[in-house]
Amino acid sequence: MNIVEGKLSAEGLKFGIVVGRFNSFITERLLEGAIDCILRHGGSKENIEIVKVPGSFEIPLTAKKLAKSGKYDAVICLGAVIRGSTPHFDYVANEVTKGIAQVSLETEVPIGYGILTTDTIEQAVERAGTKMGNKGFDAAMVAIEMANVLKSIG
């Protein structure tokens, strides 16, 4: 029996990171977490390309472009969608999530999903480096591991 598991080493891996600027007080912290994760796991700043887009809705298209370029071992998507008083939150959160999943399946490039979908600003802050950890860091961990899993599979 052969068991394939991804190692948590970013050494030599190239990452594209897409970050939504909307709610930048949250997304910048997610970005810091993702970069910190890559560097702590042996990656280098030279192998990270960051693309900033207006908001979370623009992330899937940009992620697809990065993934299809063939330059990256993984793409990390970072954004924050915070519920307001209209149904806009539901539409954006659903479509962004579906779009990112579709990109990964179509391109066979691993995607680290770091889109916060929270009911309150406080919940977003908690997930961007305070009480609940940093979901940008977590998304980068997934990207590192999955890039290595797919390399192992061939």
From Swiss-Prot:
Enzyme class label = transferase
Q: Please tell me one Gene Ontology term that the record gives under cellular component.
A: riboflavin synthase complex
Q: What is its EC number?
A: 2.5.1.78
Instruction: Identify the metabolic or biological route this protein is part of.
Output: Cofactor biosynthesis; riboflavin biosynthesis; riboflavin from 2-hydroxy-3-oxobutyl phosphate and 5-amino-6-(D-ribitylamino)uracil: step 1/2
Do the record's keywords include Protease? no
Q: Which reaction does it catalyse?
A: (2S)-2-hydroxy-3-oxobutyl phosphate + 5-amino-6-(D-ribitylamino)uracil = 6,7-dimethyl-8-(1-D-ribityl)lumazine + phosphate + 2 H2O + H(+)
Q: Which UniProt keywords apply?
A: Riboflavin biosynthesis, Transferase
Question: Known InterPro entries for this protein?
Answer: LS (IPR034964), LS/RS (IPR002180), LS/RS_sf (IPR036467)
Show the active-site residues. 88 (proton donor)
The GO molecular function terms of this record are: 6,7-dimethyl-8-ribityllumazine synthase activity
Residue sites binding 5-amino-6-(D-ribitylamino)uracil per the record: 22, 56-58, 80-82, 113
What does the similarity note say? Belongs to the DMRL synthase family.
Protein name, UniProt field:
6,7-dimethyl-8-ribityllumazine synthase
Originating organism: Sulfurihydrogenibium sp. (strain YO3AOP1)
